[in-house]
Design a protein with these regions (language model features):
Chain A
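Conserved mixed alpha/beta catalytic, RNA-binding, or beta-rich assembly cores of soluble enzyme
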Residues: 2-10, 14, 19-57, 61, ...
């Protein structure tokens, strides 16, 4: 399969089950909502070292938020249910509670699985906090020096998918970055999906473990590192001098597949040789995003089957 | 099965009747004959509902009452579901102790509307009498949940001893929120004297100005973040008349009643 002269490899991205929450931050204006969201999602690129993966999902107009103010929707994922409330509580506590003018709401109101988030955070109020029931939901008014911080008592929990990905193999670093930026721009604001890495782009795709250093959880993906082409078992076709990766987490398979389709299509620009994806041979992750199926418009979860082709490891 | 049950008053009432048999959930499973046989009470004497009302429809979730019903007491008492539509004015204790469902009164209501209710909604297009959302006689708590929306005025002691829930109205008589334990009284216009006397943790929101009792003390002027959420909900759900200026405006916060634990508040909107 080719798109505008760019080969789409017959392979798949292998992804894992995660647990996620959607956090709605509102503020006096978009600036302060963004400020808080940027802090909340800071240092949240990979569960490997950050304990969670988080990013801005999209901006919300006042008509879309519970309190009629400008807002930002954030998705945050962890590998297990137990750590999800811990990460959400510590991040909201340090980055939303502290931020001028913000309030914080659940973005998954239909989820039957509820996490106590505002409930523990209310104790910052040292007994001066007060609750209000509004439309069947409890909210906590926590007195702070600025005035009051408002937070919903419980947040919904969702089963998510983490580690959707594709790799852009380009003739130069400039082209790879242009293509990756175009891909990120095309996926920006898509519902149910985040790109947790800086600017949505990863330059240091990794493999599991290491060849030289025992105990490493991950190390450089040497098969896709152009400087190592002649001294390792390379996966790079001729003419490829730079590779960038896009990693996606989402609330469901279809959201990721939909975003991947848009992103891959946008990345097919002159100077890009091929698009491939990272997997572990299909043995570890239950979610397989087959690039050619996705680009053919098949966006639903398919029966698992390992594909042939080079196996990059995200 | 019908889409609604309609009860039409056969003749004007010359004396008060207790009509707590009339509630949407209690009528929902009954045939027209069974509905007509339900008792209304004239003091200690039972009167068949069918002698007072003509009944049309059966086994429906919506009940419509028609006629001059101002002498009918306790309609919708302990109602837990369904819809009760009252086309006219209604007597005292409408929706008292109701648990759920919706009651809409197209006219005005007498005293004790929604007293001790714990859920559902009671919307009164006209005025309501004294003690709306308050406590039953001798009880320690008024309403403990649900919403009372009065588009006109409420009488004295609205929301007295309320524990939870929201009462909102265009204007309120003296003693609104008397002895509130918690919950919300929201008044779009004028409020009578001594609002929130004995208030423990309740919120009285005055969108049209208020004479603050001496047992309250000014704390600050700020934008209460929960109010925009609450007022938006009331506007969306009940078409309560709230301007955008109210949603995000400044409010003076008075803490009180300081003769009590002082965790209650009066929030007075500041026109800019």
């Amino acid at each position: 399969m080719e798109i505008r002269g760019v080969q789409i490899d017959d392979t798949f991205a292998e992804a894992f089950g995660m647990r996620g929450a959607r956090i709605i931050i509102t503020a006096k204006n978009e600036k302060w909502a963004r400020e808080s969201a940027n802090k909340l999602t800071g240092f949240a690129t990979s569960v490997i070292a950050c304990k969670c993966e988080a990013a801005v999902e999209r901006e919300l107009a006042p008509s879309e938020t519970p309190d009629g103010r400008p807002g930002i929707s954030v998705l945050l994922f962890t590998m297990d249910s137990d750590s999800l409330p811990k990460r959400v509580i510590e991040r909201i506590g340090q980055t939303v509670l502290t931020c001028p003018t913000t309030a914080c709401f659940d973005g998954l109101p239909d989820s039957p699985d509820r996490l106590a988030i505002g409930k523990p955070l209310r104790t910052f109020g040292d007994g001066f906090q007060a609750s209000k029931m509004i439309d069947g939901q409890r909210y906590w008014r926590v007195p702070v020096m600025e005035g009051e911080f408002l937070i919903q008592e419980t947040f919904g929990k969702a089963k998510g998918v983490g580690g959707g990905n594709f790799l852009i193999l380009a003739e130069s670093a400039e082209v790879a970055l242009d293509a990756a930026e175009a891909a990120v721009e095309s996926m920006a604001g898509m519902p149910g999906v985040i790109l947790p890495f800086p600017g949505g782009i990863v330059r240091s795709g990794s493999k599991v473990g290491a060849k030289k250093y025992k105990g490493m959880i991950a190390s450089t993906n040497d098969a896709f590192a152009p400087t190592l082409r002649v001294i390792t078992r390379t996966a790079l076709p001729e003419g490829v001098n730079s590779v960038l990766e896009i990693v996606l987490d989402g609330l469901d398979f279809r959201s990721i597949a939909t975003a991947m389709r848009a992103g891959i299509d946008a990345a097919c620009i002159a100077g890009v040789r091929s698009i491939t994806a990272g997997n572990y041979g299909g043995k570890l992750g239950p979610y397989h995003f087959h690039l050619r199926r996705i680009m053919s418009g098949d966006l639903d979860d398919a029966p698992k089957a390992a594909s042939a082709g080079p196996a990059a490891q995200p | 099965m019908s889409d609604r049950i309609t009860l039409t008053l056969r003749a004007p009432l010359d004396r008060a009747l207790d009509a707590d048999a009339i509630a949407a959930d209690r009528l929902a499973a009954l045939s027209a004959q069974e509905i007509a046989a339900l008792p209304l009470w004239d003091g200690r004497n039972a009167v068949a509902l069918g002698d007072v009302f003509s009944v049309s429809g059966e086994r429906a979730q919506t009940v419509v009452l028609e006629g001059d019903l101002a002498k009918l007491r306790g309609v919708g008492s302990m109602m837990s579901g369904g819809t009760l539509e009252i086309r006219g004015s209604i007597g005292s204790a409408v929706g008292a102790r109701m648990l759920g469902g919706a009651i809409a009164v197209q006219g005005s209501a007498g005293d004790d509307a929604g007293s001790a209710m714990s859920g559902g909604s009671l919307v009164i297009a006209g005025n309501a009498g004294d003690r709306a959302g308050g406590a039953l006689q001798g009880a320690s708590k008024g309403m403990t949940g649900g919403h009372i929306v009065v588009r006109g005025s409420v009488g004295r002691e609205a929301g007295a001893r309320m524990r939870r829930g929201t009462l909102c109205c265009a204007s309120a008589g003296a003693g609104a929120g008397l002895g509130m334990i918690a919950g919300n009284v929201i008044v779009a216009g004028a409020i009578g004297d001594e609002p929130g006397a004995g208030n423990k943790r309740g919120s009285i929101v005055a969108l049209g100005g208020v004479r603050v009792p001496q047992t309250y003390a000014y704390a600050c002027t700020y934008r209460p973040p929960h109010l925009s959420l609450m007022l938006l909900f009331l506007r969306r759900r009940f078409a309560f008349p709230v301007d955008d200026a109210h949603l995000h405006g400044l409010y003076k916060r008075y803490s009180g009643d300081l003769a009590e634990i002082g965790k209650g508040e009066i929030l007075e909107w500041q026109a800019t």
